[in-house]
Amino acid sequence: MQIWVGLGNPGAQYAMHRHNVGFMAVDTIAEVHRFDPWKKQFQGWSATGRIGNVKVLLLKPATFMNESGRSVGEAMRFFKRETGDVTVFHDELDLAPFKVKVKTGGGTAGHNGLRSTEAHIGNAFRRVRIGIGHPGHKDRVTGYVLGNYVKAELDPLAGMLGAIASEADWLASGDDARFMSEIALRLAD
């Protein structure tokens, strides 16, 4: 079993924040791949299903971003999984909007959800970095990531989330390069 975690903040008021794009990604995966309904579990919401022939637990921590690692660690221990079985979907300031990159390990780049996850499970987990762009100056970062997507961004956002979900088979099978290239091809059209 793989554990795929979407990072975000719980609550309707945060639903369309750029910082919640990880939640949006796993919600779209659950819908496209017809996962079981979400249930309250592991200090968050979880849904199980299959992507290809791989069993996947989707997880949305309800602990708020800064404590996400508590939820991830609890799920990992319950299923007796290793850090390498965890994939975290998160917003990435250092990528252009709607670009998607995958890497394993690395630093947190100041992302509190990643920092918390690393503190609880180590840093050898896979990250699906979802580009939100940078507002230009570090003083504007907090307002930007905690701001809603604007109307002009909604179509590209939906296209990117759909591509992530549609190409998730590659991610589940461990072909990160193919996952990224197939998403790029879909978004180039």
UniProtKB/Swiss-Prot annotation:
Residue numbers binding tRNA: Y14, F64, N66, N112
Superkingdom field: Bacteria
Enzyme Commission number(s) from the entry: 3.1.1.29
Catalysis performed (reactions): an N-acyl-L-alpha-aminoacyl-tRNA + H2O = an N-acyl-L-amino acid + a tRNA + H(+)
Pfam families: Pept_tRNA_hydro (PF01195)
Enzyme class, UniProt record, top EC level: hydrolase
InterPro entries, per the entry: Pept_tRNA_hydro (IPR001328), Pept_tRNA_hydro_CS (IPR018171), Pept_tRNA_hydro_sf (IPR036416)
Gene Ontology terms describing biological process: protein quality control for misfolded or incompletely synthesized proteins; rescue of stalled ribosome
Site entry (Stabilizes the basic form of H active site to accept a proton), positions: D91
Catalytic residues as annotated in Swiss-Prot or TrEMBL: H19 (proton acceptor)
Feature type site, description Discriminates between blocked and unblocked aminoacyl-tRNA: N9
Keyword tags: Cytoplasm, Hydrolase, RNA-binding, tRNA-binding
GO cellular component, one term: cytoplasm
An annotated Gene Ontology molecular function: peptidyl-tRNA hydrolase activity
NCBIfam families: pth
Family matches, as PANTHER family: PEPTIDYL-TRNA HYDROLASE (PTHR17224:SF1)
Quaternary assembly: Monomer.
UniProt record similarity statement: Belongs to the PTH family.
Protein name in UniProt: Peptidyl-tRNA hydrolase
Organism: Rhizorhabdus wittichii (strain DSM 6014 / CCUG 31198 / JCM 15750 / NBRC 105917 / EY 4224 / RW1)
